[in-house]
Structure formats: C-alpha cells, structure tokens
Amino acid sequence: MAQYLLGLDAGSTMSKVVLFDRVGNELGAARRRNPILFPAPGHTERDPQAMWRDVADAVRELLAEQQVDAAEIAAVSVSGYGAGLYLVDRHGQAVRPGVMSTDGRAAGVLAHWERDGLSHRNGMRTQQRLWTGQPAGLLRWLSQHEPAVVDATHAVLFCKDYLRAQLCGDISTDTTDAGLAGLLDVTRTAYPDEFYSELGLAGWRDKLPRIGASTDIVGKVSAKAALSTNLRAGTPVVRGMVDVCAAAVASGVTRPDQLSVIAGTFSINSTLHTSPRLETLPLLQIAYPVGGYYLATEGSPSSASNFEWYCKSILGPDSVAAAASRGQSIYDACGERVGQVLQRPNDILFLPFLFGGPCGAPAGFLGLRAEHDGADVVRAIFEGIVFAHKLDIDLLLSGSDRAEVRSIRLAGGAARSPVWSQMFADVLGLPVEVTQGGEVGARGTAMCAAVAMGLYPDLDAAMLSMVRVERSYQPDAARHAAYLHKYERFTLATRTLAPLWQPTDEARA
C-alpha cells in the first residue's frame, strides 16, 4: 500500500512541496521562490507557467532527495494563496499572467462601488468586505481595460486550482477558495446572481468554476505532468483548499475559543463561529470544513515578510549563510540575539508597513539612538510585527458577534522562533501553542488527501492523528503590561503620522 502523501503549497512568496507519512510526520520538503512581476504601478502578477515549472522541479528534487519511489505516493493535493486571479482556457492554460492578492489596480473600481453604496450591500451577499485583491474588482477592471481577455477566458481559477489543472486537467475550485475570494454566498455555497449583475460582472458569471469539496479526488496525474514531475501517471489528485484554511486545519483549530494566527507573508488572524459574522463584516469569511463552523479572518501584509525583507536587504546572504554554517536558521539566529537584549530598555518602534499600512503608511523606525545595536533593531522588528497582528486581532475581536478566545495556535515564519512565539504570548496576553512541522499549508492540504484516500473518515479525525502540539508558551503578566503600554505608543504613532502619507502618494502620482 502506498504510504506517502504529497502536499503542494504555492504561497505569495514561496512554493513548497512537502512529503508526509500517513500520520502526518513531515519527512522532507523542497522550496522555490515565486518571482513577483510589477508590470505597472500597483500591479502585482505572477507567471503561471514559470510557477508550474518551478513546482514540478521541486517535486523532482524532493523525490530524489528522499529516495522515494513515485509508486509510494498515495495521492497529491494542492493549496495556494487566496483571492487574485488565474484565468485559463478550455485546456487549463493561462490566457494572461496570474494576478496576486496584493494587486491594487482595482482601487478605483472599489472606490466607485463605495460611492454608489454597492460595497456594503454586496459584501453582505458574500458575508465579507470587498477589497482590491479580490476577483470582483479585478474582473471589473479587466472588463474595462482588457476586454479581449474576457472572450479568451474559459474559467476563473485561483492559484491552487491552476496548479491542479496542470497536474490532472481538472478545472474547478473548492468551497474555501471560492468563499475567500468573495465570490460566494458562503451560507448557501452558491454564486449570488444579484452580486454579479449589480457589480457589472454578468459577462463573467458563466466563467466561474464549479465548486466541490476539498477532499474530493478530481483526477489523476497525467502522462504529461508525470514527465515534468517524475510522479507516477495515474496518481490520484485531490482538490485541496486555500492556504488560510489549510493552515488553520493543520494547526488543529477546532473550537471557537481558539485564535488561529499565521505570521507569514501576511498577518492572518482567524476565529471560528457557529454562524457567519454579519454585524461586523470580516475581511474574509468562509465555511470551515471542520465542525460545521465558519472561519472569520482579519489580515494585512504586515507580518513576517517585513523580517524576511530585513534579512535579504539589510543582513544579506552572508548572514544567512553564517547562521546555516552554525546549524541555525536566520530565525533562530536573530531570535537568539533578541533573547539576549530583552531585559534592557528599548523604546524603538518599528512600523511594519513595507507592503502598505493604514492610510498608505510606509515602514519605518522611530526612536533609534546611537547606543542601539543590531539586536535592538531586530527586537523592534519582532515587536512591531506582533503589534501589527494585534491591530488586526483587535478588529477581529470587536463587535457583539466576536469570539471569546482563550488560546492561540501560532503558525508561519514567526512560529519557528521560540523568542518570537513567547513575544506573541506576552503581547496578546494569551497562551500560545505551536504544532509540529513548519509547513502548515502543505500539511493541511495533505490532510485532505488522507481523507480522500480513506485513511480517515473526515478532517476531524485526520486532525486527531496528524496534528500534534510541539511547544507551548504562557504569557508573563509583567511583560504583558509593559507591551500594552508600548502598543499604545505604536498605535498613537501610526495615527499621528497618517496625515504625512497622502502628500507622499500625490508626489508619486
């Protein structure tokens, strides 16, 4: 009997291919960085064919490194970042570059809808706020600026769906991706026709993909894909789920009193609810595939991607290589330095808005002095990113329909660092748990494969076997009080500096 599961996860910055055994042990991984294209100001895109080639190459590398016979792969499942767009023809081939969820070209469309009173009404139809990186605004923009693309498109897909189409030819999506994209009435699992007619998207309505369960087997690895990946032709391919949901599932989030925090490229913060949140519409809301819950999410591009930029652009590859030579990741090395300076005073504030913040705020440091060193700077980066998460979490936990959380499941890059994980506990004042294995998106979608192949009856059962808490952190009351004071300074600085950014934007125009 085939004993391995393969999870593919194409995120905003990195694609990961991860091998798991039947009980969820992470056996090996191969990674490829995803280049981002900037064809015009505010436009962020990806070459779909290059992404597929890189993923296929990573699969070959992983199979070779792990010396795994492809016949031992029971099934392959996929995950990927949510929202954005991948438009394909009848053969599953891209008709234009993929659009990232960080794309801002639809800002004018969203502003028009807001002025006309369409945003809230149609947000209620899909149980979440409308925002620029979602397909609705992007499709309207394409209708206005690239009308030929409308005719060339057979189906509107999302990142994971494009990869799956290359694997087996299936053209569909699942409830989590369609829901997170803001195209779906998540209570009915149906595309609301009024939404498309009122927003001028009627020409796209018939191009929306059919929707199925994340745990369905939808095809088999084709002969062509087998040549590209070294997978066995005929290997079952499972539909999979969007990365936000996959990470929550792989973190073992099963109760409304748990807060899922993903500190990766984006700050992603989610809670479970017995019915959709409607009093305070969240940024994202989907039907959760475990326990009959709905997953409500607030987020921003203000998380560990700021630290990764610092490592790449300021520390440079030599520092990363030096850490590796000591058997450390750069997260471990920087966390170790931060741990050495936590007891000394540090008033530096870092605003982690390299990829955009409130009122268009850019990133920056406040309070630097000559006596500060690199460890103080990294500490400020760690703290600023946790504070940005708290901004999102404060919004998520507002309103009478909020969840009452008692603990946190932390995933993403920050979870690799014990010092950073403890900082999340101290800032948020809640116990933090980190589960085994670092690649939660790939693990969550591999769990879909495990259910599809009959290893477990459902995802609830798969979570009991394939998710294990590895580390836990308790908040320190004194540090929590000190961090709340510093967080007040952080929010004050963000609000006070807001008027400065509009003139800067105008100067760039």
Explain the meaning of each model-derived region.
Residues 24, 47, 76, 103, ...:
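Residue-level signal for inorganic ion chemistry
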Residues 32, 37, 99-106, 178, ...:
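Short, acidic/turn-prone active-site loops that include or flank metal/cofactor-
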Residues 1-97, 124, 226-227, 231, ...:
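N-terminal glycine/serine-rich phosphate-binding loop of ATP-dependent small-molecule kinases
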Residues 64-101, 129-133, 164-185, 210-215:
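Short beta-strand-loop/turn "lid" adjacent to the catalytic site in phosphate-handling enzymes
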Residues 17-19, 24, 76, 103, ...:
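Conserved small-residue
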